[in-house]
Amino acid sequence: MTIHIYNTLTRQKEEFIPLEENKVKMYVCGPTVYNYIHIGNARPPMVFDTVRRYLEYKGYDVQYVSNFTDVDDKLIKAANELGEDVPTIADRFVEAYFEDVTALGCKHATVHPRVTENMDIIIEFIQELVNKGYAYESEGDVYFRTKEFEGYGKLSHQPIADLRHGARIEVGEKKQDPLDFALWKAAKEGEIFWESPWGQGRPGWHIECSAMARKYLGDTIDIHAGGQDLAFPHHENEIAQSEALTGKTFARYWMHNGYININNEKMSKSLGNFILVHDIIKQYDPQLIRFFMLSVHYRHPINFSEELLRSTNNGLERIKTAYGNLKHRMESSTDLTDHDEKWLADLKKFQTAFEEAMNDDFNTANAITELYNVANHANQYLLEEHTSTVVIQAYVKQLETLFDILGLELAQEELLDEEIEALIQKRIEARKNRDFALSDQIRDDLKDRNIILEDTAQGTRWKRG
């Protein structure tokens, strides 16, 4: 089964064939580290971490690069407002970013380059563009000469005349064409700066990704990914810079994830309806948030609400409960019989369907449907009069494997027998004291942990469901 990716560049699904056999070069645009990330910022790391995990599962060696923009206008503004320097703020929010995305199940990239640590190669990249006639200096700023790059607009699928009509020259900009964009910005008084052939300044936003992608992955990469909002102008400008310099295709597959809405409204800071990751993971299990995000295809918009989160949690808990039931029955089952072969064959079909979903442009929504199918099938199997350790182990392994591909964990702390007995005794005392609310709560809590109570004339009995 081959993998097909929807390529924003061609607007169609294409068979994925990497440049080098069994190797994938992947670049994902990272955050500007001036504040905590909100859930919209967190969708790309979760989505493309899952893409990476699936490619690794399929046997590819994935070189995954995701950058940090640790100097730009937003950081300078934050530094001025807080009375701190730019590096201090950047360091703080790099650390906060790692805490948030690690909680959400994301692995570290192969490399997390920072702009400030790669200034030499960025300046060199700009100088080469100037030498080739694709860039020009204007009073300490350096701009990319867009009209010289023939393919400008091919990612956003817009004619250059239309793009130029919608562009404008801002006050203080010294460019020749409204579509030209800054590669280097002359430093204003009091701003952080680096020395360059054009004077003191710092790089523009777009050039840094082109330079760092080239440094760590080469002239041509397999997959370039990011949020839908980056397609234009950021990724369009990356293509122009990189291909003007090298004369080679910059990225062969372009992937973009959809937006997030909050309670059916577009999330935006102006509306004040954005949710910070470090806040929401205090209220909800980070694994639930990831499961929720992956329950919708990555290219589609997703509506985020607490009601939908709770509904999704019910489904996730059903899968975890099935897994817990399987683990509990592992040691008390019989040997494999001919009848068990049918169950193993069905299990293989679910595995195949999961991979077919992921091969189809990483359709995690359909892949998660197969997780539900495995869990439901497992519950049916456990109702059989005779169950085999071999089959149960196969269910357990499959659930663990598929969850790992999605960056999820199945671990569920199981109550010890002594803990169950202690809770039952507490419930008995509550009933003696006519505290029926507490009694019912203990019963319901145990039921949620798959412990079934039965009140009899001889006392309370319990069993694992």
UniProtKB/Swiss-Prot annotation:
<dbReference type="InterPro" id="IPR014729">
    <property type="entry name" value="Rossmann-like_a/b/a_fold"/>
</dbReference>
<dbReference type="InterPro" id="IPR032678">
    <property type="entry name" value="tRNA-synt_1_cat_dom"/>
</dbReference>
<feature type="binding site">
    <location>
        <position position="209"/>
    </location>
    <ligand>
        <name>Zn(2+)</name>
    </ligand>
</feature>
<keyword id="KW-0030">Aminoacyl-tRNA synthetase</keyword>
<keyword id="KW-0648">Protein biosynthesis</keyword>
<comment type="similarity">
    <text>Belongs to the class-I aminoacyl-tRNA synthetase family.</text>
</comment>
<dbReference type="Pfam" id="PF01406">
    <property type="entry name" value="tRNA-synt_1e"/>
</dbReference>
<feature type="binding site">
    <location>
        <position position="269"/>
    </location>
    <ligand>
        <name>ATP</name>
    </ligand>
</feature>
<dbReference type="GO" id="GO:0004817">
    <property type="term" value="F:cysteine-tRNA ligase activity"/>
</dbReference>
<dbReference type="InterPro" id="IPR015273">
    <property type="entry name" value="Cys-tRNA-synt_Ia_DALR"/>
</dbReference>
<keyword id="KW-0963">Cytoplasm</keyword>
<keyword id="KW-0067">ATP-binding</keyword>
<dbReference type="GO" id="GO:0006423">
    <property type="term" value="P:cysteinyl-tRNA aminoacylation"/>
</dbReference>
<feature type="binding site">
    <location>
        <position position="238"/>
    </location>
    <ligand>
        <name>Zn(2+)</name>
    </ligand>
</feature>
<keyword id="KW-0547">Nucleotide-binding</keyword>
<dbReference type="InterPro" id="IPR024909">
    <property type="entry name" value="Cys-tRNA/MSH_ligase"/>
</dbReference>
<feature type="short sequence motif" description="'KMSKS' region">
    <location>
        <begin position="266"/>
        <end position="270"/>
    </location>
</feature>
<dbReference type="Pfam" id="PF09190">
    <property type="entry name" value="DALR_2"/>
</dbReference>
<dbReference type="InterPro" id="IPR015803">
    <property type="entry name" value="Cys-tRNA-ligase"/>
</dbReference>
<dbReference type="InterPro" id="IPR009080">
    <property type="entry name" value="tRNAsynth_Ia_anticodon-bd"/>
</dbReference>
<comment type="subunit">
    <text>Monomer.</text>
</comment>
<dbReference type="GO" id="GO:0008270">
    <property type="term" value="F:zinc ion binding"/>
</dbReference>
<dbReference type="GO" id="GO:0005829">
    <property type="term" value="C:cytosol"/>
</dbReference>
<keyword id="KW-0597">Phosphoprotein</keyword>
<keyword id="KW-0862">Zinc</keyword>
<protein>
    <recommendedName>
        <fullName>Cysteine--tRNA ligase</fullName>
        <ecNumber>6.1.1.16</ecNumber>
    </recommendedName>
</protein>
<feature type="binding site">
    <location>
        <position position="234"/>
    </location>
    <ligand>
        <name>Zn(2+)</name>
    </ligand>
</feature>
<feature type="short sequence motif" description="'HIGH' region">
    <location>
        <begin position="31"/>
        <end position="41"/>
    </location>
</feature>
<feature type="binding site">
    <location>
        <position position="29"/>
    </location>
    <ligand>
        <name>Zn(2+)</name>
    </ligand>
</feature>
<keyword id="KW-0436">Ligase</keyword>
<feature type="modified residue" description="Phosphoserine">
    <location>
        <position position="270"/>
    </location>
</feature>
<dbReference type="GO" id="GO:0005524">
    <property type="term" value="F:ATP binding"/>
</dbReference>
<keyword id="KW-0479">Metal-binding</keyword>
